[in-house]
């Protein structure tokens, strides 16, 4: 059911280079009688993660930020130093009637390499670790189940090292990180790292695009 191509993962991999605000981590928000849900993933640079998940049908918004560390109100510079314990993450607000958490997990695992510890492509450090921060026990169950099935599938020679932890606090990243790929497509990192990943993602998930 979850047969994946190792080549796809290796081709889709790699992100790095105001005022910070702690974000409410409630699982749901209500808008016009539709209950939205949230998912929080780390898969390398949050510019890459944001660029991919923004294009999915059912995704309302994607917010880059930091989670998983002990430092309060972390800055991008501090997180990049690798001393805060935080990972670069994207917090996704989505409509569960249009896209499921399972589908988000599928996109998550198919657009980065979950077998490289604290590393995605050329980006190295704990801030780039593969991680799922669950909001509910159901999300935890689904993430662990999917991870186990992938591990048993033999898709990779190396073990999956994706961390699955409860989300305690989420800190919104500085404003210039938002819509970074959309606003900086001439940037070399965007052209040579993010764009190829986005293009491959579009081919694999063509039926799920907005």
Task: Please report, for each region that a protein language model flagged, where it lies by residue.
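Bacterial N-terminal signal peptides
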Residues: 3-14
């Amino acid at each position: 059911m979850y047969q994946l191509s190792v080549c796809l993962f290796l081709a889709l991999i790699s992100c790095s280079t105001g005022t910070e605000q702690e974000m409410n981590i409630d699982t749901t928000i209500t808008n016009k009688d539709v209950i939205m849900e949230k998912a929080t993933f780390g898969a390398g640079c949050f510019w890459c993660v944001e660029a991919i998940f923004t294009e999915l049908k059912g995704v309302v918004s994607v917010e880059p930020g930091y989670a998983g560390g002990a430092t309060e109100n972390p800055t991008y510079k501090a997180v990049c130093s690798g001393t805060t314990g935080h990972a670069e993450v994207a917090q996704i607000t989505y409509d569960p009637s249009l896209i499921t958490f399972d589908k988000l997990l599928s996109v998550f695992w198919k657009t980065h390499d979950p077998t490289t510890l604290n590393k995605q492509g050329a980006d190295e450090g704990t801030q780039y670790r593969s991680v799922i921060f669950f909001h509910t026990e159901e999300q935890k169950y689904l993430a662990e189940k999917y991870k186990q099935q992938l591990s048993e599938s033999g898709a990779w020679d190396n073990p999956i090292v994706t961390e699955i932890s409860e989300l305690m606090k989420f800190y919104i990243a500085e404003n210039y990180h938002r819509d970074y790929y959309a606003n900086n497509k001439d940037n070399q990192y965007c052209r040579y790292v993010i764009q190829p990943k986005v293009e491959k993602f579009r081919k694999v998930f063509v039926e799920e695009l907005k």
